[in-house]
From Swiss-Prot:
InterPro entries: Ribosomal_bL20, RIBOSOMAL_L20_CS, Ribosomal_protein_bL20_C
Lineage: Bacteria, Pseudomonadati, Pseudomonadota, Betaproteobacteria, Burkholderiales
Function of the molecule: Binds directly to 23S ribosomal RNA and is necessary for the in vitro assembly process of the 50S ribosomal subunit. It is not involved in the protein synthesizing functions of that subunit.
Pfam families the record matches: Ribosomal_L20
Gene (name only): rplT
Protein name, as recorded: Large ribosomal subunit protein bL20
Length: 119
């Protein structure tokens, strides 16, 4: 069986890992063995936070809608209930954006929700 020289593949693998570790501080960015662990950990953080990002944004949208709807005299839960009864299906992202950039339109939606709560 012929001898296999692995210098080329090892060099490529090291180069790939060190490229992914570019910008890391200290030996995490330039020593292969440590950089490999740092890159793996960074990947775990990235995987976790891609999922957390969705939760964080939803919480932000709800906080913004709550603040805006309170200025019109409704809590978030009352507002959400009114929207459901009124048959208005606008998602939280759009409602949050409307509350910030188009408060008149948001106010009109709040009034519709209020009307359905009373009726």
């Amino acid at each position: 069986m012929p001898r296999v020289k692995r210098g080329v593949t090892a060099r490529a693998r090291h180069k790939k890992v060190l490229a992914l570790a570019k910008g890391f501080r200290g030996r995490r960015g330039n020593v292969f063995r440590i950089a490999k662990e740092a890159v793996m950990k960074a990947g775990q953080y990235a995987y976790r936070d891609r999922r957390n990002k969705k939760r964080v944004f939803r919480r932000l949208w709800i906080a913004r809608i709550n603040a805006a709807s309170r200025s019109f005299g409704l809590t978030y839960s009352q507002f959400a209930n009114g929207l459901k009864k009124a048959g208005i299906e606008i998602d939280r992202k759009v409602l949050s954006d409307m509350a910030i950039h188009d408060s008149a339109a948001f106010g009109a939606i709040v009034e519709q929700a209020k009307a359905k709560l009373v009726a």
